[in-house]
Amino acid sequence: MPDLTNEILEFFSIDTSDQSLVEKQIPKSIDDFVSQPQYLNTLDLHKFTKIINILKNEGILMSGGILPNGNLPISNEVLIAPSYDAAVAQYGTYSFLTNGFVSIAESFAGAVRPIVIVSNDDEPDIGTGFLLGNKHTVITARHVVDNAKLITLTNSKGELATVREVIFPNDKNIDIAIILVDNFVFYDTKHFNAVAPEILEQVLTIGYPPIPGFDAFQLYEISSINNSYKFSNGQIIGKEISYLDGIEYFILNAKVKGGNSGSPVINRSGNMIGMIIQIPMDSEDFDKIDKLGYGILTPSSEIVKYLGGGEKKEDVTIFRCENIDKGFRILT
């Protein structure tokens, strides 16, 4: 089904790559758009006007002036979309901005999956993972899958993913795990793109916190990025004298629990800007953060760095996996 936001932007787009081309392009008015055969007597003018106003506020659509006549009160305005990008439109960014977080949650529901584990102590637990960059790469928090004797990952239809490898950073303070899926259970699932986070931007988290008496289901939380915090070299942050070497984290003013570990943090454009993690600290500090209701996320740049194998070969270790009846296990 055609998307009205993308159709508006494509209609009013101009090629700004060459100044001589810009001068030759004829600007179009709102009347030109609404007079198209497919919209005559069918266009929802309230929705159309709302989308136009949002795109203007976002700086994606610009007014090019007023024509001397028109069939409707607003129809004589000329509009220009100078930075329209077909790839951005296909990803859904423009539509996400006009339709809000609900449309993002609907579009990426299948890309965010529960990761159910059985620990070495035979205790069940749950975390979250998400597709990033392609149909075969699932990102989660390291502590979700590390030391598990059984890991279950399925698509939205309940079909089991077969896993070839799991990649861990060699620095165990980095709470990132990369799961490489071998089969095509996510072939029809939309994956996330990654961009950098910004302070105070509004974000959405999608995760699977365990709630007694219920099967795993997605919960949504809208919040904002409050601040970034960078551990300085050699700072002691736990009783075990763990040191973090210049690792940057962001603070989220959303209360995140258990199964939210590994949840993607998503901005208004539908891009993944980071992941909910745990950081090494003593129990007293952890309780303080928990009571404040904050979440901690690692930024997308840290995740992308390890997707490429790290800056040096010794930055990561690749573990082969054995696929069994109800999931897979990591061979160590």
Give the predicted meaning of each segment.
Residues 188-250, 256-260, 276-292:
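Flexible, gly/ser-rich surface segments that form the specificity/activation loops bordering the active-site cleft
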